[in-house]
Amino acid sequence: MKRLLAALALIVLGSFTACKKSAPTLGLLVWEGYADPSFVADFEKRCQCKVSASYMGSSDELVAKLRGGSASNYDIISPSSDVATMIATTGLAAPLDLSKIPAYKEVMPQLTSLPLVKSNGNVYGVPFQWGPNPLLYDTTAFPKPPDSWSILWDPKLKGKVSLWDDLSSVYMAAQVLGFDKPDPHTLYNLTDDQLAKVKAKLIELKPNVRKLWSTGGELTNLFENHEVQIAMGWPLMTNQLRKRGFPIGETIPKENTTGWIDHLMITAASEHKDLAYDFLQYVIEAKTQKQVIAVTGYLPVNPGVAQYLTDEEKRNLHLDDLDNYQKRIYFWENVPRRDRYNQIWNEVKAAQ
């Protein structure tokens, strides 16, 4: 009997020990590059946890997953500035206790002062990365940087263009039509008449579009396989292609461009909020931001990162002329009629 009791005790003790040793898993639903092992591994080691990341291809995909009942699968999300306000005001994200994120005070005030993730006196998101949607091009096909988005409609580029399968393509066409003059905010508040003209303009572009892309890797492959020569993209693809030795160029055309501020939010359904706070603090620290931008090529939110960069790296990130660079980017805002915009974009894709 004693032997039986001793055996049972060992089993119970073993089960408890195994449970105690099991590492918590932090679930992320974020943009590509935002959970790269180069900086996540140190966090996992430091906090004795696992980070499980899923990646999204558009802001609408993120919203659909959160509304579709899978919010409980994720502790942290990285909405862009065009849906961050909606997420902050509809109970999908938890209000933040900023005292648990000391590095928040180090973030650029140009970003934290914006109302994008604030509601009823609470802050719901921490700026993480920001940047433009630039025009990317194969420098062997364009020895000089294209100076206008309108080049995408050049008949010589039939079958050589790629667009992001996202509402940013709607914003871009609206810029080509001049709807952002004199007020860039108009891009996110287009009338039905303006949207009809945007739709017609994008349908005109379809013969030139070889393929729409949804993830950064897709566009990188399209360039590497010489399937396209020019596209709207992200600095992430520029960074990836340069590392692979591809002759990629990146520019902001004369019409300027739209861009985004990606925030990290803790979901209301998160069961690991303390660990999520630790992650937010970790990734906006200056040292970690240096590792993040090495992967993404995006702009850091913590200006303290400059102490870890060479002069060339600062120039490549436009940190030597930050104010003027930001003026060329019309940051995404909440789109009150987002469903209508999506309808227009879907009609463009369906048009023959």
Q: Which residues does each PLM region occupy?
A:
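A bilobed periplasmic-binding-protein/Venus flytrap-type ligand-binding module shared by bacterial periplasmic
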Residues: 134-141, 176, 261-272, 291
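Mature extracytoplasmic/periplasmic domains
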Residues: 258, 267-329
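Extracytoplasmic ligand-binding site segments that recognize negatively charged/polar headgroups
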Residues: 78, 83-84, 88-224
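Periplasmic-binding protein-like
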Residues: 196, 201-205, 242-268
